[in-house]
């Protein structure tokens, strides 16, 4: 038996993006809306601009609440607008 006949069982997944953001809504079942802030420097004037993007993320246990800081990871499309999932809750709201 040669090594070439053995199939590769542990295939590598592609690189998945991670984002950190603040939960702004948890009213949907197993879904949270997370505001992810991006700071961009203006090309001409050099001023730092804050850009916010709202992402819908899958939260299987409904553990995240409004005001929590969460870590998101990119995943396959789970619905029409949901392409992220909550990996962990970094900080609970006070």
From Swiss-Prot:
<dbReference type="GO" id="GO:0003735">
    <property type="term" value="F:structural constituent of ribosome"/>
</dbReference>
<protein>
    <recommendedName>
        <fullName>Small ribosomal subunit protein uS17</fullName>
    </recommendedName>
</protein>
<keyword id="KW-0694">RNA-binding</keyword>
<dbReference type="GO" id="GO:0019843">
    <property type="term" value="F:rRNA binding"/>
</dbReference>
<keyword id="KW-0689">Ribosomal protein</keyword>
<keyword id="KW-0699">rRNA-binding</keyword>
<dbReference type="InterPro" id="IPR000266">
    <property type="entry name" value="Ribosomal_uS17"/>
</dbReference>
<dbReference type="InterPro" id="IPR019984">
    <property type="entry name" value="Ribosomal_uS17_bact/chlr"/>
</dbReference>
<dbReference type="InterPro" id="IPR012340">
    <property type="entry name" value="NA-bd_OB-fold"/>
</dbReference>
<dbReference type="GO" id="GO:0022627">
    <property type="term" value="C:cytosolic small ribosomal subunit"/>
</dbReference>
<keyword id="KW-0687">Ribonucleoprotein</keyword>
<dbReference type="Pfam" id="PF00366">
    <property type="entry name" value="Ribosomal_S17"/>
</dbReference>
<dbReference type="InterPro" id="IPR019979">
    <property type="entry name" value="Ribosomal_uS17_CS"/>
</dbReference>
<dbReference type="GO" id="GO:0006412">
    <property type="term" value="P:translation"/>
</dbReference>
<comment type="subunit">
    <text>Part of the 30S ribosomal subunit.</text>
</comment>
<comment type="function">
    <text>One of the primary rRNA binding proteins, it binds specifically to the 5'-end of 16S ribosomal RNA.</text>
</comment>
<comment type="similarity">
    <text>Belongs to the universal ribosomal protein uS17 family.</text>
</comment>
């Amino acid at each position: 038996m040669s090594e070439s006949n053995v199939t590769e069982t542990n295939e590598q997944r592609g690189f998945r993006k991670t984002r950190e953001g603040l939960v702004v809504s948890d009213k949907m079942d197993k879904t949270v809306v997370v505001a992810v802030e991006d700071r961009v420097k203006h090309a001409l004037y050099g001023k730092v601009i804050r850009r916010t993007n709202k992402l819908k993320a899958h939260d299987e246990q409904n553990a995240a609440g409004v005001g929590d800081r969460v870590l998101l990871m990119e995943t396959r499309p789970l619905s029409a607008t949901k392409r992220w999932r909550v990996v962990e809750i970094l900080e609970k709201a006070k």
